[in-house]
Regions:
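Transmembrane beta-barrel wall of Gram-negative outer-membrane proteins
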Residues: 28, 300-415, 419, 661
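C-terminal beta-signal and adjacent terminal beta-strands/loops
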Residues: 851-858, 881-946
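A beta-strand signature from Gram-negative outer-membrane beta-barrel systems
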Residues: 100-102, 211-255
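Outer-membrane beta-barrel signature, preferentially recognizing the C-terminal barrel domain
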Residues: 431-455, 595-608, 681-733, 738-741, ...
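Gram-negative outer-membrane beta-barrel transporters
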Residues: 737-740, 760-856
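Extracytoplasmic beta-strand/coil segments of soluble accessory domains associated
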Residues: 156-196, 219, 237-238
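Short, acidic, small-residue-rich periplasmic hinge/interaction motif at the N-terminus
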Residues: 34, 46-48, 79-81, 97-148, ...
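Short acidic/polar hinge/loop motifs at secondary-structure boundaries
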Residues: 67, 167, 195-224, 244, ...
Length: 946
């Protein structure tokens, strides 16, 4: 070997040793970033390693790492919004291995007369998780961040993602109301910033959740156990919508999006002109005793036209800042959503009476009078604005003013083909309808809610705290000129051959209706809390009360116009809607029915409440909160009913004592066991007490009639929950609940006064409702799974009729008692989501599945003929990508599986696969009475935040 070659090899070996040494001296820098005060992980904190200039972001569990860093001393610089910057020095050696644990402090602004600590961002997932963990009651929370990256844009649709919650959908397929733990929507209460708000619904107390744009919220809290300081009229739960609050520094957020419904890929959107619609009825414009001319009912809003709708529009803007040396905080947030939704619907109209069963061992079969084939086209404008001003006088006294205005305008065109089932005539082999009515209905449904709340917080002494609220709220609904035009044709079977002929169309009666109502609340709240010690343990005694005065006014006036006969006194032949001629028969029909319409009423309600409670901690493990609340209810109303009819007016008074006890045992700082007992009530809806009939929306098939003999409902509630809050966003909860319900209110079919069938509320004895809840969320790096499952079992003793043929040949009516679940309760509901969340790529995505088990929609008068909503599986998708620090692009897809809404009767379908089979039937195991399809919808858009 030559010396030159030996030298090369030695030099190569030297460099290999040097490189290997450098590699061996390299190590990873790992660590976690936490909040100094709460010990929560900080997600998305910016970490810079100098002098290398390497950058990274903390992950979902607050962790970060820099790979293969050579031995030496480095400086870490950590920044996070709302926190003071942190700098620390780290030395890398061969043995470096233990992760760093870094704590950041929230920024503190020093004022001349007041110290204001930077408030936590209530819109984050971390805040929601921490609040669930530290709350005094059992609660589930969804943050604004989770809402933004979910497939949903309204509060109602977000609700279906929460444990124990299912939703009821409207004609457009969007959610409207929440059912919590199997308790129908009537048993739940909606709050804005902890304050109860009135409902624009013309019959009920519950608030339509689709009126709330999700962009206005910081978070949604579903409170499942009540403390004494909370109002007691909630059995299922309380939905607290926490609006955005004034920030600690300037913020600007905006959203612009668009979308489309797949329904209108296949058909046109039907619209109608609104310029000629009068907001008030002729009787309101001219006076109650003035006969309205036919010209007061222009035809323009009945002439529907079809075309492809424009894309949907979704806009929002939020601005906030602090002024006057940070004493004054201001935020203004607004949202506007314009969408075109709809559905294709098929309905079998059920007859008021059903034929008898062949004997006592067989079931009765349902009977149907009509088949409705409908197309709904709805233009929905949803807008909202909320503002808050808060002023800190000093460290002991502050005041705030919240104002919220919400509006939901829905203009719906409903095209109906109504086939009259007159029966079957087998001799001529004809099976089908005996008349066809083509109907056009146009409806404007205008709802609004405003709320103004003035609140103050005062630290009277070091131990004594006070807070108070003065509240004014109003909810309105206007449904001006619900117009329906109908054309009828006779169907005449031909002899023996099974064919038929259809007569030329004739003009039928025209209906025009005006509905409007207002619900006004004036409320005052006051609370005192005194901090003390008992037996060496910390305690807080609380006392307070509230008063609410509610006034509800309801107006309803219906006009029926009769077509003018031709010169031969025959039916008027249909040419066109503008060419159709009408008159009033009898002549006083021109007054409408307002004079005797019980839908015109004035309702007063006064509620006084007081409570006392004690929060007591035993060491660091036990926490108790218990006390007693009393609520005194005074109601009176006066309607336009005849004085000879029960329910024209009433005075109703009752008092309730509502005890409550919440307990919590903490195994450590992440694991706890909660338990609670509380008593709650449900006050009947206003219109449920007044016996007038009305169709509440364009989708209603049956009249709803009130019952003046209803009693209010009382409920005893028990809860138990075990919870684990893991690292990052991981969590696990499992719990059980039980409710004993005295005098539950359910809607049942009953014959009306006109030979038809109507829905009527009634008390149904006692009921038991119990169940289990499971919640989980777990991330594996950037991927995760989340979900919840709720099992609910309820039992109510119901009374039904059973009509059958006796062995003697006669018929008999028996009153039978049978057990069934509560109306609206699904035995099983579940959510499951596949998640992707990367702080490095700034991509969030989720594929979300919701399962809702079958549930009773309407209770039948007859045994075994209840209407059930068939179980559903809904699949949605959303994803977003953040660009830089300020811009986000998102996409959302809803109802990917095109899941229909179906009502069924769980009786054997005797006519299935037979000559007399009814339309849109799917199985011999049940009878389908309604089948609605909505199709998928798509949204894309941009958000920015400064």
């Amino acid at each position: 070997m030559t010396p030159r070659l030996v030298g090369k090899r030695i030099l190569t070996a030297f460099f290999l040793i040097l490189i290997t040494g450098e590699f061996l001296l390299a190590a990873d820098i790992k660590g976690y970033v936490y909040d100094q005060n709460t010990k929560e992980q900080l997600v998305g904190a910016s970490i810079v390693l100098n002098p290398l200039g390497q950058k990274t972001l903390s992950s979902l569990d607050g962790s970060f790492s820099f790979k293969n860093i050579q031995a030496g001393t480095y400086k870490l610089i950590i920044n996070y919004v709302g926190y003071s910057a942190l700098e620390t020095t780290v030395t890398v050696t061969e043995s470096t291995g233990r992760p760093l644990v870094l704590y950041m402090l929230p920024k503190v602004a020093s004022l001349s007369t007041v110290i204001v600590s930077s408030s936590r961002n209530g819109a984050t997932d971390e805040f929601a998780k921490r609040r669930e963990q530290t709350a005094s009651s059992i609660v589930n929370i969804v943050s604004a961040n989770s809402i933004a990256i979910s497939p949903d844009i309204t509060v109602a649709n977000v609700m279906q993602r929460i444990s124990g919650v299912s939703i009821e959908r409207g004609n457009s397929g969007d959610g409207q109301y929440a059912i919590i733990r199997g308790m129908d929507k009537r048993y739940n209460t909606t709050l804005i910033n902890g304050i109860k708000i009135p409902s624009p619904d013309n019959r009920n107390r519950y608030v339509p959740l689709d009126i709330f744009p999700a962009e206005l919220l910081d978070r949604i809290e579903v409170i499942k156990s009540l403390t004494p300081e909370m109002e007691g009229d909630a059995a299922g739960g309380v939905i607290n919508l926490v609006m955005k609050k004034a920030p600690d520094k300037f913020i600007a957020e905006a959203n612009i999006g668009t979308g489309y419904s797949q329904l209108y890929f296949n058909r046109n959107f039907q619209s109608f002109p609104i310029s000629t619609i009068n907001s008030k009825s002729p009787a309101e414009l001219s006076g109650p005793n003035i006969y309205a001319p036919v010209s007061a009912f222009p035809y323009n809003n009945l002439v529907a036209s079809g075309s492809k709708p424009p894309p949907n529009l979704n806009l929002s803007l939020t601005l906030g800042n602090r002024f006057m040396d940070n004493k004054l905080g201001v935020i203004v947030s607004g949202s506007y959503q314009n969408s075109y939704r709809g559905s294709n619907s098929n309905v079998l109209l059920q007859s008021p009476t059903v034929p008898p069963a062949p004997d006592s061992s067989h079931s009765q079969q349902p009977a149907f009078s009509d088949i409705y084939s409908r197309q709904y086209s709805s233009k929905i404008d949803r807008s909202g604005i909320e503002t808050q001003l808060d002023y800190n006088f000093n460290s002991k006294n502050s005041i705030s003013l919240f104002a919220t205005y919400l509006q939901l305008n829905e203009r719906t065109t409903r095209i109906t083909s109504d086939s009259l089932l007159g029966g079957y005539s087998t001799p001529n082999n004809y099976v089908g309808s005996f008349a066809i009515y083509d109907k056009t209905q146009t409806r404007s449904d205008l709802q609004s809610i405003y709320n103004v709340t003035l609140q103050g917080k005062n630290k009277l002494t070091d131990r004594l705290l006070a807070d108070w609220s003065l509240v004014a709220s109003e909810a309105k609904r206007e449904v001006p000129d619900v117009a329906e035009f109908s054309v009828g044709r006779e169907v005449n079977p031909n002899t023996n051959n099974g064919t038929f002929t259809i007569s030329s169309p004739v003009v039928e009666n025209e209906s025009r209706e005006w509905i409007h109502n207002t619900d006004k609340d004036l409320s005052g709240y006051g609370n005192l809390k005194y901090k003390t010690t008992i037996a060496g343990n910390s305690a807080v005694a609380g006392f307070g009360g509230m008063y609410r005065h509610k006034e509800r006014d309801n107006y309803d006036n219906v006009y029926t116009l009769t077509p003018v006969s031709d010169s031969n006194s025959n039916y008027q032949q249909f040419i066109s809607i503008p060419a159709s001629k009408f008159t009033f028969i009898p002549y006083n029909a021109a007054l409408g029915n307002a004079a005797g319409n019980p839908g015109i009423y004035h309702f007063n309600e006064n509620i006084w409440a007081a409570y006392g409670q004690l929060k007591y901690n035993i060491g660091t493990k036990w926490e108790f909160l218990g006390g007693l609340r009393t609520e005194n209810t005074h109601q009176d109303y006066l309607s336009s009913l005849s004085s000879a009819i029960a329910g024209k007016s009433a005075n109703i008074n009752y008092i309730d004592f509502l005890p409550s006890l919440q307990g919590k045992y903490s195994f450590d700082d992440r694991k706890a066991l909660r338990f609670s007992y509380f008593k709650s009530i449900y006050r009947p809806a206003f219109a449920d007490l007044i016996p007038f009939g009305e169709r509440n929306s364009s989708g209603d098939v049956y009249l709803t009639i009130g019952n003046p003999y209803l009693n209010h409902t009382t409920i005893d509630n028990l809860d138990l929950r075990y919870e684990i809050f893991g690292k990052g966003l991981d969590q696990f909860m499992v719990g059980a609940f039980y409710k004993f319900i005295n005098n539950p209110i359910e809607y049942a079919f009953e014959p009306d006064n006109y030979g038809g069938i109507a829905l009527k509320p009634d008390n149904f004895g006692n009921a038991n409702n119990y169940g289990l809840e499971l919640v989980f969320r777990k991330f594996f790096g950037d991927f995760g799974v989340s979900g919840n499952y709720t099992y609910t079992n309820s039992e109510i003793n119901a009374r039904n009729y059973f009509y059958y043929i006796q062995s003697s040949g006669g018929t008999a009516y028996d009153t039978v008692h049978n057990k069934r679940p509560l109306q609206g309760q699904s035995a099983n509901i579940a959510n499951f989501s596949l998640l992707y969340k990367s702080t490095k790529t700034k991509i969030d995505a989720q594929l979300a599945l919701v399962y809702t088990g079958s549930r009773i929609n309407t209770v039948s008068l007859y045994k075994g003929l209840d209407n059930w909503e068939k179980s559903t599986v809904n699949l949605d998708f959303s994803a977003q990508k953040e660009f830089g620090k300020h811009y986000i692009f998102y996409v959302k897809v809803n109802n990917i599986l095109n899941t229909p809404f179906q009502l069924i009767i769980k009786q054997h379908n005797n006519t299935y696969n037979s000559k007399t089979n009814l339309p849109f039937q799917e199985s011999s195991d049940y009878v389908t009475v309604e089948y609605d399809k909505f199709d998928a919808s798509y949204s894309i858009g941009f958000r920015f935040k400064f």
